[in-house]
Design a protein with these regions (language model features):
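A recurrent short beta-strand within the Rossmann-like NAD(P)-dependent oxidoreductase core
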Residues: 150, 179-180, 184, 199, ...
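Mid/C-terminal beta-alpha module of Rossmann-like enzyme folds, strongest
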Residues: 11, 15, 195-243, 279-281
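Conserved Rossmann-fold NAD(P)-dependent oxidoreductase catalytic core, especially the SDR/UDP-sugar
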Residues: 82-120
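NAD(P)-dependent short-chain dehydrogenase/reductase
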Residues: 134-187
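Conserved C-terminal active-site "lid" loop/helix of NAD(P)H-dependent oxidoreductases
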Residues: 219-225, 238-281
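NAD(P)H-binding glycine-rich loop region in Rossmannoid oxidoreductase-like domains
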Residues: 36-76
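N-terminal Rossmann NAD(P)H-binding glycine-rich loop of SDR-like oxidoreductase domains
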Residues: 3-20
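Glycine-rich NAD(P)-binding loop of the Rossmann-fold in SDR/ketoreductase-type enzymes
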Residues: 37, 68, 72-83, 119, ...
Length: 281
């Protein structure tokens, strides 16, 4: 199988290349290509590679930046996925793309949220990710969108790293500064390696939208405390009162044979894989 990957130098894409070595023929867009490319340039590149699957991981995912720069967000998060879809349609490739749990921002419903929920995202990033889903599926009904949660990894293997829950907690502990979390903020958080493991079978999913990540029945206050305890560190947590529910119901993916650990199980696995099961003590 020939797979063309966008965002291959990013947090997830670099780990896809690392974990999938030898599993398929992996091709990437040149670094910086998508930042300047128009639709015709993308189409020509896809035609040259002739992939079986386009795995579109590239995005502009800084929600604050997207809020302040909506045109940049629209190009990266709506236009480019649509151009990918048209190129896939013309070449006969399957398109599998990341969406985000941020499409659920603004949801009033409690508990795990299904893919069928009527949505009205409260931030620009979530609005654009939802629009991309809708517009791409109109052009390419067999495209697959995976709504992923906040992901994390620990530094290692010379792979790029970015801010995430365990690293944020570690920095706060080292600096002696408090971190803020709400007892009314609910979301799953996933170990990126598990996401990438499940991403390979997801290439064969029927077209549509799928929630794709770990469950979590704990608030972010409880989750942060659990992560800190597993790390063996002491962190001061300031409890705030703002409300958000991004918890995703994973039953649709589970019905296709794709399952995830809970948020807490996933972090315990992460520590085992880095030989840190006893924490950092």
């Amino acid at each position: 199988m020939k797979i063309l990957i966008s965002g291959s130098s990013g947090f997830v894409g670099s780990r896809v290349l690392h974990q999938w070595q030898g599993r398929a023929e992996l091709f990437t867009f040149p670094r910086g290509f998508l930042a300047a490319a128009d639709e015709s340039a993308i189409r020509r590149f896809v035609e040259t590679v002739q992939p079986d699957v386009i795995l579109h991981l590239a995005a502009l995912s800084d929600t604050g930046y997207c809020q302040q720069h909506p045109e940049d967000s629209r190009r990266a998060n709506v236009d480019v996925p649509l151009w990918m879809a048209r190129a896939a349609a013309e070449t006969g490739a399957k398109l599998v793309a990341f969406s985000s749990d941020q499409v659920y921002s603004g949801a009033a419903q409690e508990g795990p949220l299904p893919e069928t929920l009527s949505l009205s995202p409260s931030n620009i990033y979530g609005q654009h990710k939802l629009e991309a889903e809708q517009r791409v599926l109109e052009v390419l009904p067999d495209a697959v969108f995976l709504r992923v949660p906040w992901m994390y990894d620990l530094p290692g293997y010379q792979l790029p790293i970015r801010g995430n829950l365990p690293l944020n907690l570690l920095r706060a502990a080292l600096r002696g500064t408090p971190v803020q979390f709400s007892a009314h903020d609910w979301r799953g958080i996933s170990f990126v390696r598990e996401v990438i493991e499940n991403l390979y079978p997801a290439l064969s999913l029927p077209g549509g939208v799928y929630n794709f990540g770990s469950s979590n029945d704990r608030s972010m206050v409880e989750t942060a405390r659990q992560f800190a305890e597993l790390l063996g560190i002491s962190v001061a947590i300031e409890i705030t009162d703002w409300h958000r529910n991004l918890r995703m119901d994973g039953c649709k993916a589970t019905a296709q044979g794709i399952t995830f650990c809970s948020t807490q199980e996933g972090f315990a696995r992460c520590l085992r894989e880095y030989n840190l099961s006893g924490g950092l003590r």
